[in-house]
Amino acid sequence: MATNYSANQYEKAYLPTYLQNWSPARPTKEKIAAHEGYTQIIANDRGHLLPSVPRSKASPWGSFMGTWQMPLKIPPAKVTLTARTTTAADNLTKWIHKNPDLLNACNGLRPEISGKPFDPDSQTKQKKSVTKTVQQAPNPTIIPSSPVIQGDNPDEPQSSHPSAGHTPGPQTPVNSPNNPPPSPCKSTK
């Protein structure tokens, strides 16, 4: 077992030469400059407040709440009501505002309540009132200028489902301004 440890093995890593952050020391003044303003004395040598200092009549420590004065369970500081039901959101906000001393204390709770509660009753009513309309797609048509692909034989029976065949786009004449003639430079294969 190793019994002798040099403190250098710990401190050496933090020396300026090893950290490579050595720089010349800042120049210091021989006499410290006087600060502007003054320090107001509010207590005597024994630590008691002087009579001229205003003091709270309720408590000399202000509104500080000690550990024993706090409630057994402290509510959360940040609350989101978004995923909660209306009754759960009401119970939670009542619990937060139940102890006003905790809310008013200088070291007390500053709750942040955000979001809107979820009402399942209104959601079911909306679902019942909404009716779904299904629109029947028209039968697919075959464009005469399109190339013939296996399965596009007009003799074969066609399915009435829109995804079964070719869904046509807008039809334009072959030599219209929107559809110029093919370029002779491009080879089509």
Curated annotation (Swiss-Prot):
It is found in: Cytoplasm, Cytoskeleton, Cilium basal body; Cytoplasm, Cytoskeleton, Cilium axoneme; Cytoplasm, Cytoskeleton, Flagellum axoneme; Apical cell membrane. Coiled coil: none annotated. Residues 178-189 have a biased composition (Pro residues). GO terms for cellular component: apical plasma membrane; axonemal B tubule inner sheath; axonemal microtubule; ciliary basal body; cilium; sperm flagellum. Disruption phenotype: mice were born at the expected Mendelian ratio and are viable and fertile but show basal body docking and ciliogenesis defects in multiciliated lung cells. The keyword Cytoplasm applies. It holds the Pfam family CFAP126. Expressed in mono- and multiciliated tissues during planar cell polarity acquisition. This is Protein Flattop. It comes from Mus musculus. The lineage of its organism: Eukaryota, Metazoa, Chordata, Craniata, Vertebrata.
